[in-house]
Amino acid sequence: MTLIHPTAVIDPKAELDSGVKVGAYTVIGPNVQIGANTEIGPHAVINGHTSIGENNRIFQFASLGEIPQDKKYRDEPTKLIIGNGNTIREFTTFNLGTVTGIGETRIGDDNWIMAYCHLAHDCVIGNHTIFANNASLAGHVTIGDYVVLGGYTLVFQFCRIGDYAMTAFAAGVHKDVPPYFMASGYRAEPAGLNSEGMRRNGFTAEQISAVKDVYKTLYHRGIPFEEAKADILRRAETQAELAVFRDFFAQSARGIIR
């Protein structure tokens, strides 16, 4: 059963599936689709060509699907796509994509996005991430699965943060953060391996050791980057936990933190 507060303003063209709950004074635009059993708190605003999956929980004053903060945007029908089982807390802002990017902003499944976080246009967020309060992404940022962003983390446009990586409080990410690694500092630098996150997600001691050796190869052995990368890619052919480095290196446009 869909439950809509009488003060909510929902365009007749919006599509709400069964079990959706909408709180007081929330506004939902005409091109919005909301999946089953998603709960939307009071005073939220959902606009644009926005698709939201099932079993999400969206808190009060969230702003989803507004136009991107890009002066080149000319009201093109770009999109915001949100998956299933996400928690989206108070005062978060997720913008539509742009035609100069991929045309959509995408959020996967089971993400925990805390208050005041900002996801700019054309960002792609994986699954099972945690964004602590006030983490902000510029446009075209890619965040992998199981990433943890510390509070007030700022990520520069076009940066990538690999699977299972973690940033410290107020990290300023200006280059790509490889999978499994931690980053900290105003101009983020390598800060070790996210070994605790790996353990919590079922990695064995042997797998963690293999990734730790990758970290040492990149940062502690004095090897030129291209030589270190070639060595890591060779190892990735036989070690499954290192396979993520193949795609990461291939798709990196800004270079990695050093």
From Swiss-Prot:
What Gene3D superfamilies does this protein map onto? Hexapeptide repeat proteins, Udp N-acetylglucosamine O-acyltransferase, C-terminal domain
Give its localization: Cytoplasm
Q: Which CDD domains match?
A: LbH_UDP-GlcNAc_AT (cd03351)
Q: In which pathway does it act?
A: Glycolipid biosynthesis; lipid IV(A) biosynthesis; lipid IV(A) from (3R)-3-hydroxytetradecanoyl-[acyl-carrier-protein] and UDP-N-acetyl-alpha-D-glucosamine: step 1/6
Which GO BP terms sit in this record?
lipid A biosynthetic process
GO MF, one example: acyl-[acyl-carrier-protein]-UDP-N-acetylglucosamine O-acyltransferase activity
Major enzyme class: transferase
Source taxon at top rank: Bacteria
What keywords would UniProt list here? Acyltransferase, Cytoplasm, Lipid A biosynthesis, Lipid biosynthesis, Lipid metabolism, Repeat, Transferase
The EC designation for this entry is 2.3.1.129
Q: Please give the catalytic activity noted in the UniProt record.
A: a (3R)-hydroxyacyl-[ACP] + UDP-N-acetyl-alpha-D-glucosamine = a UDP-3-O-[(3R)-3-hydroxyacyl]-N-acetyl-alpha-D-glucosamine + holo-[ACP]
Task: Describe, as the record does, how this protein assembles with itself and its partners.
Answer: Homotrimer.
- Reported function: Involved in the biosynthesis of lipid A, a phosphorylated glycolipid that anchors the lipopolysaccharide to the outer membrane of the cell.
> Which HAMAP family would you find in this protein's record?
LpxA
Task: Give the record's family classification.
Answer: Belongs to the transferase hexapeptide repeat family. LpxA subfamily.
Spell out the protein name for this chain: Acyl-[acyl-carrier-protein]--UDP-N-acetylglucosamine O-acyltransferase
The protein's organism comes out as Neisseria meningitidis serogroup B (strain ATCC BAA-335 / MC58)
Question: Taxonomic lineage per UniProt?
Answer: Bacteria, Pseudomonadati, Pseudomonadota, Betaproteobacteria, Neisseriales
